[in-house]
């Protein structure tokens, strides 16, 4: 959309002016710069369908990668005034003037008790759909349509598990520090850390001890 392109360009202009030595990767305009160590990854409107239909589950995602791994992430929901800020190896911050919330994932040691979330069933490819369906069978129930906002809710202890595929670095980069700084884990479906070379699958859980069981159900 025009809003996507204009928002990304505004962010690019600020970063280029203040940090000209850093590279930038955005959903709308691709890669600029060649610095191999520091890379800003931008998604001005994650959840375009939600944005276009007036549902406040979209958000702006900004992340900073260092040597291929995300070390800083921001999820911003401008309608509700909520913002999550994650920095590697530090507690996630939640900022909100209107809505209450305390950062911290909740215990959920068994998949059978877990609330599962995914943006939409149609994001599943033919190869991934049966694996996701198997995970569904082993969880309590599934909710749809959260986009990046679901990961913020996981960091607040409202959701237990999120499993998605066909994700790009601008979709998940900001989510990693936010989820991990709240006490959760976020990996690919094999349980491996997410990098720029990852396969597009994303698995997040609030209770880190649940990860091996989830990976088994998705295998």
Give names to the regions the model predicted.
Residues 1-45:
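N-terminal subdomain of lithium-sensitive/metallo-dependent phosphomonoesterases centered on the IMPase/IPPase/PAP
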Residues 2, 6, 52-55, 145:
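Residues at secondary-structure transition points
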Residues 4, 15, 48, 77, ...:
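Residue-level signal for inorganic ion chemistry
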Residues 5, 28, 44-47, 78, ...:
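Generic detector of well-ordered alpha-helical packing
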Residues 34-93:
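DPxDG-like acidic metal-binding loop motif
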Residues 65-69, 79, 88-91, 97-98, ...:
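Short loop segments at secondary-structure junctions
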Residues 104-219:
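An extended, acidic
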């Amino acid at each position: 959309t025009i809003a996507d392109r204009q928002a990304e360009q505004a962010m690019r202009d600020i970063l280029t002016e203040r940090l000209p030595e850093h590279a930038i990767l955005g959903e709308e305009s691709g890669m600029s710069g060649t610095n191999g160590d520091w890379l800003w990854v931008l998604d001005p409107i994650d959840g375009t369908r939600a944005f276009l239909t007036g549902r406040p589950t979209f958000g702006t995602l900004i992340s900073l990668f260092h040597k291929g791994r995300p070390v800083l992430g921001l999820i911003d929901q401008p309608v509700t005034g909520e913002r999550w800020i994650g920095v590697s190896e530090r507690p996630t911050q939640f900022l909100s003037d209107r809505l209450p919330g305390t950062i911290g994932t909740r215990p959920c040691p068994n998949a059978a008790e877990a609330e599962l979330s995914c943006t939409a069933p149609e994001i599943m490819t033919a190869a991934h759909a049966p694996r996701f369906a198997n995970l569904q069978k082993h969880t309590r129930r599934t909710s749809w349509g959260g986009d990046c906002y679901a990961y913020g809710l996981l960091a607040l202890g409202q959701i237990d598990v999120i499993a998605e595929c066909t994700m790009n670095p601008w979709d998940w980069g900001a989510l990693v520090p936010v989820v991990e700084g709240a006490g959760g884990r976020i990996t690919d479906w094999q349980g491996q850390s997410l990098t720029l070379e990852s396969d597009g699958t994303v698995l997040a859980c609030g209770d880190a001890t649940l990860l091996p069981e989830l990976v088994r159900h998705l295998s």
